[in-house]
Amino acid sequence: PLSEKQSGWDWFSLSLDDGVKLMGFQLRQTDGSTFSSSSWIEPDGSLTSYGNKEFVAKPLNLHTVGEKKLPTRWRLLLKDKNVDVTVKAINPNAWMNLSIPYWEGPVEISGSHSGRGYLEMTGY
């Protein structure tokens, strides 16, 4: 569950074509700030963790599903690994209007790296 000061989260789990895995998330705060963290996993299993603000997720456009406006295309940056990618929802209409509403679904990755992955978002 989110705290009273958090409005939602955006969670990315990406499998890059070179065998690397990138997991990153940001927690959106009610004051407009964010907290982010990520993990970079090499094909050999070695792990590098990144703290707040090293992983950057910026929405590029909003898609309307019902009465919700959802960011279904993102720019992700991880400067230490020269990552500058666009993440695009394969099915932008995948909003789940349940007791805790959320969006989740597969994504395509293009830019400095390519691949596929998964995105989950809440608080929209």
What are these regions (language model features)?
Residues 1-124:
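Structured soluble/peripheral alpha/beta segments that form catalytic or ligand/cofactor-binding pockets
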